[in-house]
């Protein structure tokens, strides 16, 4: 079949675009089986069916098109948009991840010079930005599953590549979340396996810093996860409660406010151990964290997360107190302050939260009471302002209403009566009024005559 041309669609291809808009996967599958349908056909704007499906957020449709060989990096759009850019604009995290796994390039720019991550950030789809920025191709990890050079064995067993890749690509950098991911996979939760994993992470970190296009963000992330793995090894070797003990150490809060001091110190120590002191990112992190006292904002975790994942602080979202997962929607039933993503996280955190739960409850109730008082005060103030406005309006209406004198002047009969009175006065005292001059010259003569008459009267 000849390569597709922009705007040259067969009737079946036009039907396919319509079916994609409706989300009918079965009908789309039937049309894709037709010899008259090219999976990468282009509409008049240069959009492929995959771009249409990604922009409309059709997950199953995207999966179907990729199975049929859709080109995830097709760049025929009139403004240079790719399928990954449309996925980011749609805000669909699953489709964004799907495009990346299918091999979508993240550094391609459109006609205005923006990458997919920048376009997603521009429209406020910060979750998609985080996914794109944290994506790590599986092929780069599979490289270490094969013997290289003089090595007789690979640095990373094949069975560990999948679980390790899942942790590397996670967008949640909370240390408890990383330990939970290790704990849930029996293959990883062993000393030998973790040792191999953190050595590979150190190699990736070194490669990121020494390659031509240096990637400090990815290097810092690999180093951070490596530090968490090394602590896991320590607890597996030295503690009877093993990883559960590590999680408790990370969550244990100090008595006065429940702040997890050990967790904060661990993250600060991990950043400080970054082996490339000249890195700009390291210097920025140190400047942001060093002046902050333990227990104050910003925490080391929040600063590190923003630097690595690109998550912004002004986004309104609730995070789980235990594992840091975004979108927590369950509150402690007593204090109504602490958030969790599920009951397991609440149970895990209860051993330390119970010490400060009542205190937090009192603080919360006090804040609610003050908020209610402030609300009532604002309502009273608003009512008072409205009453003053109404009173001012009534006063202005009274002032603008015509009085009894104005009514008298408005009566034409009174005007006539006044004119008659004036005529009578003029008849009785003709000397009292000077004649109205017709010209300036006559006016001056008349004034002179009056003045002369007054002088004569005074002499007599």
Curated annotation (Swiss-Prot):
Query: Which cysteines are disulphide-bonded?
Result: none
Sorted alphabetically, which keywords does the UniProt record give?
ANK repeat, Cell projection, Cilium, Metal-binding, Repeat, Zinc, Zinc-finger
Q: Where in the cell is it found?
A: Cell projection, Cilium
Detail which positions bind Zn(2+) 1.
320, 323, 341, 345
Region of interest: Disordered: 371-460
- Where is Zn(2+) 2 bound in this sequence? 332, 335, 353, 357
Q: Which residues form a coiled coil?
A: none
ANK repeat placement? 45-74, 79-108, 159-188
The function of this protein is:
May be involved in the trafficking of signaling proteins to the cilia.
Q: Which PANTHER family match?
A: ANKYRIN REPEAT AND MYND DOMAIN-CONTAINING PROTEIN 2
Q: What is this protein called?
A: Ankyrin repeat and MYND domain-containing protein 2
Species per Swiss-Prot/TrEMBL record: Gallus gallus
Tell me the name of the encoding gene.
Answer: ANKMY2
